[in-house]
Amino acid sequence: MAQQRRGGFKRRKKVDYIAANKIEYVDYKDTELLSRFISERGKILPRRVTGTSAKNQRKVTTAIKRARVMALLPFVNED
C-alpha cells in the first residue's frame, strides 16, 4: 500500500524475508539469519522495521531468545 506523499516520495512496501525465501522453520542455530532481525545493540527489531508477518515474527523472536540462552547470540551488544 504505497501512498503518494506531498514530496512525491513513494514508500516501498517491506517484504517478509522468511516468506519470500520459503523458510519453513527458523532454526535458533542459524545465527546468520537471526542477525538480520537484531539491531547493533542486540535488540530484536520490530515488524514495522523488518517487514515480517506476525506469524514469522513470533518464530524469529522465539528463535532469537533460544539462541541467547544457548549463548549463540548476545543479550546486549555493548560497544
From Swiss-Prot:
The cross-references to PROSITE patterns, in alphabetical order and at most eight, read: RIBOSOMAL_S18
Q: Name one GO cellular component term.
A: cytosolic small ribosomal subunit
Show the InterPro entries listed in the entry: Ribosomal_bS18 (IPR001648), Ribosomal_bS18_CS (IPR018275), Ribosomal_bS18_sf (IPR036870)
MF annotations from Gene Ontology: small ribosomal subunit rRNA binding; structural constituent of ribosome
Instruction: Specify the domain of life of the species encoding this protein.
Output: Bacteria
**Keyword Ribonucleoprotein carried by entry:** yes
Keyword Secreted belongs to the record: no
Q: Which UniProt keywords apply?
A: Ribonucleoprotein, Ribosomal protein, RNA-binding, rRNA-binding
Per its UniProt record, what Pfam families does this chain match? Ribosomal_S18 (PF01084)
* GO BP field: translation
The protein's job, in short, is: Binds as a heterodimer with protein bS6 to the central domain of the 16S rRNA, where it helps stabilize the platform of the 30S subunit.
For this chain, the family text in UniProt reads: Belongs to the bacterial ribosomal protein bS18 family.
PANTHER family given in the database record: 30S RIBOSOMAL PROTEIN S18 (PTHR13479), SMALL RIBOSOMAL SUBUNIT PROTEIN BS18M (PTHR13479:SF40)
On assembly, the entry states: Part of the 30S ribosomal subunit. Forms a tight heterodimer with protein bS6.
* Name the UniProt record assigns to this protein: Small ribosomal subunit protein bS18
The species this protein was found in: Streptococcus suis (strain 05ZYH33)
The record lists the lineage as: Bacteria, Bacillati, Bacillota, Bacilli, Lactobacillales
